[in-house]
Amino acid sequence: MADLGAEDKLKQICDALRIETLKPAEDEAEAIVRNAKEQAKRIIDEAQERASQIITSAQQDADHKLKQGESALAQAGKRSLESLKQAVENKVFKESLAEWLDNALADPEVSAKLVAALIQAIEDQGISGDLTACIGKHVATRAVNEFLGKSVLAKLKGKGVAVGNFVGGVQLKVEDKNWVLDLSSDTLLDLLMRYLQKDFREMIFQGS
């Protein structure tokens, strides 16, 4: 905006002197002011355009970084959730299953049934040879032998079961072929985990 005080003074001088030679100077001054205003407007417009570009670029950069942050946060959340699921599975599912399995395999009758089932399985496959049955170290061999009965014991080397170096379950060794059929507690736990893990996850983590 032009300085009104300066314009008033200029008008007063022109009126007082009444000299026509000042008219061209006045016109020149108006042209200079007009040109200055136009240049100022261009500068302001260019500055506003540049500022708009900077803001847009900054906003796009911020949006990109925000999306990257959101993506990283989502990935971190997924990893944390998966870690939590693994922790719950190990603590709640695996430990509970292991405890139940240990209790079940502590029963001499269960060990006897597992031994009998393994012997029957190899006989069905036409396999024969010296057999050694080992049971968990916390299970009484005498009780297992009683549950097996004479007909099954007669098929075993030593006419009875031996104590293995595992907690529970059984192992049947086919000595001639150097085979070991393993239904020890650790093996059974792994089998049950694989078969039941999906159902457990769907039941506990449904919707997560």
UniProtKB/Swiss-Prot annotation:
Cross-referenced InterPro entries: ATPase_V1_Esu (IPR002842), T3SS_HrpE/ATPase_suE (IPR009335)
Keywords on record: ATP synthesis, Hydrogen ion transport, Ion transport, Transport
GO biological process, one term: proton motive force-driven plasma membrane ATP synthesis
Molecular function as annotated in GO: ATP binding; proton-transporting ATP synthase activity, rotational mechanism; proton-transporting ATPase activity, rotational mechanism
Entry-linked NCBIfam families: PRK01005.1
Cellular component, GO annotation: proton-transporting two-sector ATPase complex, catalytic domain
Family under the similarity heading: Belongs to the V-ATPase E subunit family.
Function: Produces ATP from ADP in the presence of a proton gradient across the membrane.
Pfam family of the protein (one): HrpE
Official protein name in the record: V-type ATP synthase subunit E
